Structures are given as structure tokens and as C-alpha cells.
Amino acid sequence: MRINPTTSSPVVSTLEEKNLGRIAQIIGPVLDVVFPPGKMPNIYNALVVKGRDTVGQQINVTCEVQQLLGNNRVRAVAMSATDGLMRGMEVIDTGAPLSVPVGGATLGRIFNVLGEPVDNLGPVDTRTTSPIHRSAPAFIQLDTKLSIFETGIKVVDLLAPYRRGGKIGLFGGAGVGKTVLIMELINNIAKAHGGVSVFGGVGERTREGNDLYMEMKESGVINEKNIAESKVALVYGQMNEPPGARMRVGLTALTMAEYFRDVNEQDVLLFIDNIFRFVQAGSEVSALLGRMPSAVGYQPTLSTEMGSLQERITSTKEGSITSIQAVYVPADDLTDPAPATTFAHLDATTVLSRVLAAKGIYPAVDPLDSTSTMLQPRIVGEEHYETAQRVKQTSQRYKELQDIIAILGLDELSEEDRLTVARARKIERFLSQPFFVAEVFTGSPGKYVGLAETIRGFQLILSGELDGLPEQAFYLVGNIDEATAKAMNLEVESKLNK
């Protein structure tokens, strides 16, 4: 791993200081810069524009070289607003790509695309930095073993297990619990795997970024009293930022995650919210650079850009980066080039259902819509596979019977179907689980359920051994022993009430 001992905003050596250019043209966030003959910067080099605008305000804009136009001109995309820039202003070639701080100093802090802290908590230790443009790990470095990434969340581990070093798509509308699920995963990886997380907010609402930060502080994922004990680093490039920043903020977050994997040899969770905005920003930049648009107006380099990000997210022999990416589907059209290109890279999908959230079943993961390439007998074992398939079959049969129940009632069903419905309702409730990060809101302690316990619990429900227990005993409990204990308590309470 290459580590450049530079600071977060590119520092210029005296030798490179002579490599100065001048702004020739400004088109919104795109700058054309003229350099002396033979002094052309490389593609992806960071350029810095420093000076004062017409009212004397200090300007410090970092850009990234995207095209070499000929005639000693380069075209660069700005990473921040270009307000106040003028033709003829001096531009410094830093001689290297953007570099951002990496390592333990990033935990508990919020950064922008340039790796500058934006949380007003003072400077960050920038002795260890890394360039945001790196090649994906070589084939020989990859860890090709297929292994399950245990999350401690029953519905995920049983029905749509995550792959260590894999990529998971998180689908769900507003208010169905995406943020809480993300925070629980951050908490569980820190406790069970001793790992850390990096959250990349790509082109989403600033309010949502602020809410997430506040909720993380409240739930202890970010430790305010001792920042070093925090479990997550946050990198934001929100909706109000120029397209250059939104296009590169995912790479900044990924670079921080790669350091934890390659140098600290840890398991890392990388969250990207939202991967669609990364594509959208790339589309804007592509149009600004004058490229001919491709299908549905997207950039012609769509799959290349997506591949260069996704291929760096993988397991190596040192550690793993497991990525969970929120996917916005424009107009609910899964054939749109942006989500369609994303699907090609995903190992699992976790679909959150508004119907389940309305019933109060959290996490509101849809057991029938969520999928995983890992759910195969040769990977998870026959016992796990059989249990998962039977849970899905029972849930599917209940779904088919719901219309009949709504019209005719339960009494009109056959004995076998009534038994199926009773078990399916127990399964539905047993798929709910109290979260550690929700303790502050619910008052009930969180539960981490191991995979073996999860399988045992569902086998007992499917076998009919627990048919005599009331279904409310299975709601918001950890393992199956807690459900039987809760059933006994309910029985005692009902006797006392009589």
C-alpha cells in the first residue's frame, strides 16, 4: 500500500511550485487551464487555485485534471464552488492525485471529499495520507474463499446472508428503517468482528447526513467523550456540492476503508448512500466535459466508472471490505442503466418493506424479496439452506392465503392451511429483533443472535414443537429460548389478571 506523507490539502514542493498555469476559461464547475510547454500535469492530478476574488475574499479551490486538450491546455473539474474565480488566475499543479488522511485519526470525524474535517472539532492528524486513485488489488492478493459475514441479525443471516468482502444492495423508501439497520450493522461489526466502518454520504440530503451523525452520537457508535473509541468515519459530499465532489466522495470513503483493510488488517464495513448519486454526478461531469451521452442520457463510461469503484471493494489476504450500498431506483424502473449496472456487482439484496414497517416488525426486511448468491447448500450447508427454504415456503403460502383470509376468515381454511398460517405468523414475528442502537428509543436491550441459534429457532417453529405458544411471545426477542420464556411470563400474567 502506498502511503504518501503529505497533508490532506495537497502541499506543493518548491520544485513543483514553478509548474504554474493560468485559468483560460470557466464553465460552471469546469476550468480550462493553460500550462507552459512541457509542464503539462497528468490526468487525475490535483490543481489548486489560490487568490482573492473581487471583494477581497480568500479563494482556495481544488480541481482534478480530467482531459488534456492540446495546445498546452487541460480541462479540470472543481471539487468545490467556483464562485469568484476569474480568467488569468494562477493555478498550481500539485504533481499528485488528491490525497486524504487515513488511519485511526479518521474515526468519529466527518470529512469532505478533500479529506478536510467539517465537524468543527479541530484539525486531524494528517501524517498518514493516501491517494484516492488506486488500482484494484491484483488477482494474486485476493482471498477467494466464500465465507459468510455474520451480522447477528436473524432475518439477514438466515434468508439473505452477506458475503465477507461482498457487496450488498439496500433497497427501501423513506422511513422504513434504512438508517437504523445501517447503525446496527456498524455496531455489530465493531462488537463481533472488532472491525470499523466508513460511511460515504454521496449526493444525499444534508439534513439526513446531520440526522445520521446525531443518531450515531446518541447510540454510542460515535463516542463524544473519547473520539478515538468511535467505530465509524464519515465522509460527506451532499446534494448541494458540485458534481466533481459528489463523483469523488465515494473514492475518498473507499480509500479510508482500504487503509483499515490493508494496513490494520481489519474487517471493514463500507456504506455508500447513495450509489445512484455517484452515477448521476458522473453523468453531469461527462456532459460538462463534452462527451456524447449514451443510453437514457447517461455517460458513455458508466460501466467503467462503476467498475473502478466496485472492484476495489473486495477481500484480500489481509482483511475484507464488505460494502452495503443504498440503491435509489429512478421511477421504480429496475432496467434503468444506473441500477442495472449496479446489480451486476451485487452479491446480495436486502429489501425493506413498508408493509412490515407498518405492522411494527423491525427490521422491516422482506423475507421473500431479499436475495443472496450465498444461499447455496455448498456454501451455507444443507441444514441452513433447508431451513431458509422452508421459512420462505411457509411465508409465501401465508402471503397467498391472505386474500382468502381477508374475505372468508381463518375458519374457512383447511386444517393444514390454518397450521401453516399460525406458523408463518410466528415466523414473521420471530424475524423481528430488538436492536442495540434502538435501546435509547425502545427501552428494550438489543440482541445479537448467532447463526446456529437462529437456525435452531426456526427449525423448532417449523417442526411444530412450539405450536402451543402464543404468537406475541415471538415478537421482538433474540433467540428461541427468550420466546419460550416470554410465553411463560405471558401465561403467568394472564392467570394473575383473571
UniProtKB/Swiss-Prot annotation:
F-type ATPases have 2 components, CF(1) - the catalytic core - and CF(0) - the membrane proton channel. CF(1) has five subunits: alpha(3), beta(3), gamma(1), delta(1), epsilon(1). CF(0) has four main subunits: a(1), b(1), b'(1) and c(9-12). GO terms for cellular component: chloroplast thylakoid membrane; mitochondrion; proton-transporting ATP synthase complex. CDD domains: ATP-synt_F1_beta_C, ATP-synt_F1_beta_N, F1-ATPase_beta_CD. The keyword Nucleotide-binding applies. It comes from the Eukaryota. It comes from Hyophorbe lagenicaulis (Bottle palm). Belongs to the ATPase alpha/beta chains family. ATP binds at residues 172-179. It catalyses: ATP + H2O + 4 H(+)(in) = ADP + phosphate + 5 H(+)(out). Keywords: ATP synthesis, ATP-binding, CF(1), Chloroplast, Hydrogen ion transport, Ion transport, Membrane, Nucleotide-binding, Plastid, Thylakoid, Translocase, Transport. Its EC number is 7.1.2.2. GO terms for biological process: proton motive force-driven mitochondrial ATP synthesis. Produces ATP from ADP in the presence of a proton gradient across the membrane. The catalytic sites are hosted primarily by the beta subunits. It is a peripheral membrane protein. GO terms for molecular function: ATP binding; ATP hydrolysis activity; proton-transporting ATP synthase activity, rotational mechanism. This is ATP synthase subunit beta, chloroplastic. SUPFAM superfamilies: C-terminal domain of alpha and beta subunits of F1 ATP synthase, N-terminal domain of alpha and beta subunits of F1 ATP synthase, P-loop containing nucleoside triphosphate hydrolases. It is found in: Plastid, Chloroplast thylakoid membrane.
